[in-house]
Structure formats: C-alpha cells, structure tokens
C-alpha cells in the first residue's frame, strides 16, 4: 500500500472516530466499565423509599448549610466544586455514612465520577453525584455531566446512582468574589440518563517537548 493510500485510509478512520456517539444509556455504560449493575430506583421498594427520604433530609440540611456560609467563587460554573463538602457534612450530621468512593485498588479517590458513596441503611451502599445549576440554563445543551473511563474506577458494587442538584444564585459580592446561595434542590435517578461519547486527542510532556518539535528556546 502506497503512502498516499495509507494516509487517505487513516484520515477516514480519524473522521469516523471523531463523530460523537449520542444517547448511550448510562446504566449500560457503567455496567460495561465496572462490571456492576446500576439499580433503578423502585418506588415500591421500601428500602429505596427510605433511602430517598434520607436524601431529602440531606438536601434540606445542605441548603441550610450552604446559605449560612455562602459559596465564594468568581464564576457560577465553579460553584459545583464546593457543593460536595456541604452534602457530606449533612450526611454526617444525620449519622449516615458518606465518603469518597473506594476504588478497586482499595484507595479513596476524589477525582472523577461519582463524588460520594453513601449508606443510610446497614450495608446498602449507593452512589451520589453533586451538581449545581442555574434555573435559566435548565434547557441548555451545555455539557454539565462527565464520566471518564479509568483503570482504577470508583464503582465497585451495584447500587442506585443518585444525582443531587442545587439551584444556585448570586446573593452578593464580597472581597472581589461572588457569594452564591441556593433556593432549591432536585434529586435525580441516573439510571435512564442518556449520555454522549466524544473522543479526545491528547499527548504528554515527553512527546510535546521532544527536540525535533522545538523551534527556539532560551534560558534567562
């Protein structure tokens, strides 16, 4: 095969790769990545109902904690980074178990999906992702949910995958920061969430700074 023909075939493969795959079912993606089933919330299951009622208590207390302290951030899209600590504090105040998930290697991991692993009934653990939203952007197509494959994945058992979302608004300014508070919450079941797959190209420093790429450099 000549170089030109090979290059054309490679270009076609790349073009196919970069086309996003849309509306993949969340529960099947998690099963494929982790080997564990995602449980769908069942309103007829007493244990599921008890768990949801506990999450409602946690959501209400989280709102009070957020509004008492406020969240200082430059931009609204950064607020979600601070939500988790308030939710975890609320779990603890109710004597529920909640912590960063333990990976398959037995380590606590903060980055990546999901934010928390929790238990309100003995030995019944579920997962929780914490989010913030602005009601004005509820119907936007902006990406707000991310899930990346990892060798040391944070899903190590079956369970319900809940998402807790807080509506935030800018209350006032303080020390060159916006102070955000919340006026409501939603609890979601991620089982039927549709997610898209979009490929990403990346490199690393070893390849980025190799000598044949450097055009000029200088130490000062």
Identify the meaning behind each predicted range.
Residues 111-113, 123, 158:
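Short connector loops at helix/strand junctions that flank enzyme active sites
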Residues 130-175:
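Catalytic cores of nucleic-acid endonucleases
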